[in-house]
């Protein structure tokens, strides 16, 4: 095996920071050694097996909690009328640990319980930090822990899929995945949505909002119980059945995991758990997120790192999760959370503004995940562009497999919002879509859930606006909708075809789902109208949504069958005057004419020799185009010219209709 080069060797601009990079690496290596048992980090991370409620070998119950500021802790619940009693008092074990052992008959499947924690000067009800099941009372809205011990444990039937070097990700939210105005379930998703994902050809499911969160409208980002699967979507067995069904179809399941902060709630969450504000969090202002109103973890504490690392291990062990998208990584990495600042140079990544404790934790998390399952993968959501974040740890990086290419979606919005079609720059589009570090892998997307949220707009809605409500019928004649349909397909195709190493689509955007996402809240009368997916729009032949879906399926199929992400895109033509962008990738040529009015006959450009066949065009009638191109058209480039080169000037000539993209494959 060839020696792995350090990131400052592959990027000379990082050489001034060699000492910092090496120091980080050594520090993290030392932490790994301290947390490991032998050479195994996995063997050393087991807090979830010690704390919380578990069975003992003699079939009793044991419950443990870490609360160093507590003076007394009681188990309260249906079994003792929710009253503190000595029979249910935990005994101190030292080092802040507390324990109680109960006979089998005291607790059973479905029993509701909480903790009552007393501390100097006060006390309150709390949910266990390592609780794995919580339920909400429909009347009081209060959450309780629930004993979960079904008579028959779930039996896994299917093996996890293999490695995903180039994931094609379908981002989804279980609760808003149904058509009815209510919270949808795991079982409904497995039955109704998973087959759609498989039919489209996506090979990875990225699921949001799995960790329990008190406020549904937070989109799952205000987590209270990190080990608890959100019960509003169903039972643990129903989620396992969903994961199992995805694996049966060869689809990996990635979890959107929130380790960047915790909800400020005290009754449900970790805030002031034992009366101290800094149990798992930073003390003072640093422990409170100024923009999110939540608590910020102190990643320098061993207890915090053990808690979060155990959380990763738990989800992989218990639910066979194949990987994680780490949310809010920028907020974790910087003391100011990256708020209202521009990242303009490498100094931003290697100076006092970085929370090195967070870097340590993220590197350890990646090591743990990789040791548990070498085929698992991780994705970082980071807007700062920190160098090395998605580089291997051995190379001096943090170890993520991929980073989200977040600037691409922002740029599409900017171009649509601020420029006329005639002002679009082919050079700018090419640069923004392909600009990435050579040593790091990226996931590209034209839009994700962020662009669909209330207050923002999806691409299709920006392109069509109010005419989406009146002119999406096939018989309607609307230049605005025609433009929107054409650009929606072109934008997605060019984004996928230039993607660094993977591609993401948010649920429903493949067919141009109308309107925005707005979860039930006081401001909208607690309505679910905009917190659902109207799948039926993509079914009738008389609506144009169906044809956008058909194109997305064909596009994903092309990317997989041609293996385009195995190669690096190569620019062939960047024609600013005519608004034409042409590039090659793997065995394909992608030619896009963004010109709003002009079509070009016999547009010539240099291309590799061989026979080229048209395999996909956005203008096809089956994709609601105008049918101006002939499917399966063949073009031939001679093998060599007089000078022996395998390219000719103006050697391939195409008809490029306005607002159209075509994919050619070399036979």
What is each PLM-predicted segment?
Residues 1-170, 175, 187-201, 480-489, ...:
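Carbohydrate-interacting/catalytic domains
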Residues 91, 215-220, 264-274, 390-392, ...:
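Short glycine-biased active-site loop of nucleotidyltransferases that positions the nucleotide triphosphate
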Residues 135, 152-164, 169, 173-354, ...:
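Substrate-binding/active-site clefts of carbohydrate-active enzymes
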Residues 136, 320-322, 340-529, 560-608, ...:
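Conserved alpha/beta catalytic core and glycan-binding cleft of carbohydrate-active enzymes
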Residues 193-196, 238, 242, 304, ...:
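Alpha-helical packing segments of well-folded alpha/beta enzyme cores
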Residues 213-215, 260-265, 325, 331-335, ...:
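Flexible loop/turn segments at secondary-structure boundaries
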Residues 228-232, 348-356, 476-482, 535-546:
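A short acidic, glycine-rich active-site loop
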